[in-house]
């Protein structure tokens, strides 16, 4: 008959631009999403940066998830573009998965805004 319509959950996958261990990240993302993907449509939210953001986009593609892109507008906002983008992503998402080296200011900003908006956040130190 009719297929049950699943709710949508938006998941930011972000982190350091120099992080490129897809196989390791995939295992961690699978673990983080194991419960919510059963009863929800997943949308991966991407900041369109290299590294962890690109890993998130690849993961979405391989798993048949939609991707919503939030590129930073460096030409308009200059150095503020990254934090502005991170705030936007934190506002609209349900979950955040970050791959962080403990130093990246951009990832720290994403974590900050996720906490400000009381989002469920998983941080994998790399």
PLM regions and their residue ranges:
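Acidic/glycine-enriched connector segments
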Residues: 2-11, 18-126
């Amino acid at each position: 008959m009719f297929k049950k319509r699943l709710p949508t959950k938006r998941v930011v996958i972000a982190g350091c631009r120099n992080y490129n261990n897809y196989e390791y990240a995939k295992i961690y993302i699978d673990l983080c999403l194991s419960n919510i993907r059963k009863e929800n449509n997943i949308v991966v939210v991407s900041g369109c940066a290299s590294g962890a953001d690109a890993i998130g986009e690849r993961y979405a593609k391989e798993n048949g998830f939609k991707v919503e892109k939030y590129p930073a507008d460096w030409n308009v906002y200059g150095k503020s573009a990254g934090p502005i983008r991170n705030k936007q992503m934190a506002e609209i998402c349900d979950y955040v998965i970050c791959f962080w080296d403990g130093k990246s200011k951009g990832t720290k900003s994403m974590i900050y805004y996720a906490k400000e908006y009381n989002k469920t956040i998983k941080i994998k130190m790399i």
